[in-house]
C-alpha cells in the first residue's frame, strides 16, 4: 500500500469516534443535517457528525451545521484578538489540504474545522473549577 493511502486510513480512523453498535445514521443528507441540528450540545453534534459522515465532500455541509451549533457556545464571548485567532485556526484547516485533490480531503478539512469549533466550545462552556 502506498504511504498516501495508509495516511488517509489513519486520518479517517482518527476523526471518527467509537459509537455503540445500535446507533444508526439516517440514510439521507437532509435527515443527517436534522440529526446534527437536534443534538443538544456541540459535543454530541460533533460525535454524530463523526458517526454519520460520508468521508467525502458531503461532509462539508454536515460540518457547517456542527460549526454553527458549536459557535453558538462561544462566538459572542470572543474578544477581537480571540476571534482573529479562531478564524486563523479555521483557515489553517483549509490550507492544510488545499493542494490535495479528491473529495476525501474536503472531508478532512471539514472535520478539522468542526474540531476547532468543538475545542473552542469546550473552552468557553466549562463550568467552575473545583
Question: In which residue ranges do the predicted regions lie?
Answer:
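Mitochondrial intermembrane space
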Residues: 21-130
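Sec-dependent N-terminal signal peptides
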Residues: 5-15
Amino acid at each position: 500500500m502506498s504511504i498516501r493511502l495508509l495516511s488517509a486510513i489513519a486520518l479517517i480512523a482518527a476523526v471518527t469516534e467509537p459509537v455503540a453498535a445500535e446507533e444508526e445514521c439516517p440514510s439521507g443528507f437532509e435527515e443527517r443535517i436534522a440529526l446534527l441540528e437536534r443534538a443538544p450540545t456541540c459535543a454530541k453534534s460533533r460525535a454524530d457528525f463523526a458517526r454519520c459522515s460520508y468521508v467525502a465532500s458531503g461532509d462539508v455541509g454536515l460540518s457547517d451545521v456542527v460549526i454553527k451549533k458549536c459557535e453558538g457556545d462561544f462566538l459572542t464571548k470572543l474578544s477581537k484578538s480571540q476571534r482573529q485567532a479562531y478564524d486563523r485556526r479555521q483557515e489553517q484547516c483549509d490550507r492544510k489540504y488545499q493542494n490535495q485533490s479528491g473529495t476525501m480531503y474536503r472531508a478532512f478539512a471539514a472535520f478539522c474545522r468542526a474540531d476547532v469549533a468543538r475545542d473552542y466550545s469546550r473552552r468557553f462552556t466549562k463550568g467552575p473549577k473545583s
